Amino acid sequence: MAIPNKLLFSDLLKHNVLCDSGVDHGLIISPWMHPPAHRILGWISRPSALRLQREIWKLDQLKGINEQEVYVKGVSSVSDDQTLERFPTLMNANIFNRNGQKIGLIADFLFHTKTGNIQYYLVSRSNPLIPGTSRWRLSLSQIIDK
């Protein structure tokens, strides 16, 4: 249940969020991030497939992780899909070369679990949901326009 120093965000996706009271807060569905600073602030979970309510968790609430659950301490902030759609994110964002041609999309990223700083992005040339698709590393120094 230890927290690694660095983590791929995809390692958190589809994990159930459990609080210190033992309540299941649903699956992690997306990151909460600050793209200009290349930093993850936390994540968003969906407590119920039937309700539109979503819960936002700060990165410093992370207390443990195993193969199926993420353990948190404290209370989440509650929001809805319409509000969260306005949150900026780079997940699934298109990547273009200097000539303006699309070369892929951001499929994942590696971040430091204590600071939230993103070390690099993983770019997929095709649909990242298809198993076995190739991914290549995009370092922050290669990004011209944030």
Where does each model-flagged region fall?
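Peripheral interaction segments used for macromolecular assembly
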Residues: 1-146
